[in-house]
Amino acid sequence: VLFLHLVMQRNFFIIAAVFIFLEIYIYQAIRTLTDNNWIKIGYCIISLAVYGFFAYEVSHFSRADRSMMRAQIMISLFLIFILPKVFIVLFLLIDDIFRTGSYLIGLTRPSKNFFPERRKFLSIMGLGLGGVLSALFIDGITFGKYRHKVRRVRMNFANLPKSFKGYKIVQISDVHSGSFADPEKLQHAIDLINEQNPDLVLFTGDMVNNVAEEFKPFIPLFSKIKAKDGKFAVLGNHDYADYVSWDSPEAKKKNLDTLIDYERQAGFDMLRNEHRIIEKNGEQLYILGVENWGLKPFPQFGRLDDALKGVPESAVKILMSHDPTHFDYVVKKHPANVHLTLSGHTHGMQFGLDLKNIKWSPVQYKYPKWADLYESEGKMLYVNRGFGVLGYPGRVGVLPEITLFELA
């Protein structure tokens, strides 16, 4: 969100020119389809209001603003009102290029190269596709972010102690509590977690967007999560509150301490480059947790060596690390055999195709390991699609995830 604001501030006139170009074509499409002046006037008024809001937000952006509400409104308007127009313009632009090209090479005269019915058909096609995309983004905001899905994964470990056969672990990630106005709307998701009857619940970071107070209203709700052997958590990049300004380093540190305390009140034991031992019938399972480690500019506070101190080499180890790049750059190259790493961070970009045989999201071009289970050099990584939302306050195609692992 910060990056989006900076880009728009620095390239304001270029972006404004692109928007003007879009609107010229859109107005042509509307004029092709209707002679009703009230429709044209209404569209112009709405457009001016939306662009006026954008201009105001970009010019008044400040890192002192801790709320994501205004940013969410801006992103939603962009996705619902502006992005779909690209489809309309694409259809009309192709028609214009075809007509201009035919004229330039002498195939037709301008008067014979204009087909109003073709123009009308292309306008309808563009408006139709744009309308569908807008409807999907609206649905994602209204319903999609609450369609939590349980994904079941069976994990086979060659040296798993017998006492842990059938052991059930639930992973959730990226709650981003500040993106939700009403905790009660997430009650069904908490019920889904408890219905899995987990032995252990692991949270892999980003409980908030910016500040600890976002999570305070959610403490009673997340306290309802039940797990026989406890609930553990690690920090994500957003938990450090790097995306808002602070009066002093002490104030920023106090915010982090407050967040950790709030998560403790909700029943989560925060692992900061350390481990915990789960023991059953004299046999052990080791749960490791590191602080966030990602490629710059993300924090690199994770210390795997510290988390491994005192852990037997032969032990089955499950690592919580928020950012999946930590797996590729550190974990899989580490001499210790960390059997399974659990991450989040990508959200699946909250948009894409997430079908059984077709998986695509724009985020895969930044994070090749963006969702599901991966294996590399004998070690496993699972990337959770996230529990909440950030920026765009919805989900299209990539649903919020609760992962249930059964050890075998």
What is each PLM-predicted segment?
Residues 1-146:
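Non-catalytic terminal accessory segments
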Residues 8, 68-69, 74, 125, ...:
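Detector for methionine-enriched segments
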Residues 10, 31, 63-66, 70, ...:
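Arginine residue identity/basic-tract feature
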Residues 69, 136-138, 158, 306, ...:
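Hydrophobic alpha-helical segments with strong N-terminal bias
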Residues 102-105, 135-168, 180-184, 188-191:
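C-terminal segment of N-terminal export signals and the immediately downstream linker at the start
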Residues 116, 123-126, 133-156, 254-272, ...:
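A short, flexible N-terminal coil/short beta segment enriched in small residues
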Residues 160-408:
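Soluble catalytic domains of enzymes that build or remodel membrane lipids, polysaccharides, and related
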